């Protein structure tokens, strides 16, 4: 439930099907050209990234999205989460999500809000 004290730290979103979200997040795992999952203005030499983990899980009253990769592009996670949520809302098809992940065509260019997004660990 909404709390003004948490508003800066979480994005309030209605409950969704975590099983389906994980199925969709599984499409991101592996080596991918994520050119349609980055904002312009980054200084990356390449948009190729390897995603090791992309999953969603429940923790207390929260739904957590967890990504682990060999690097991230500017806006990548916010675009990825927004795209998954659009499929869950029925505003984008699973096929369109797959095509965007396969760098064939961009269907979603909207970002999920930054509230609650944080980098938890850097591994070398």
Language model features with spans:
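Structured-RNA-binding interfaces characteristic of tRNA pseudouridine synthases
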Residues: 1-124
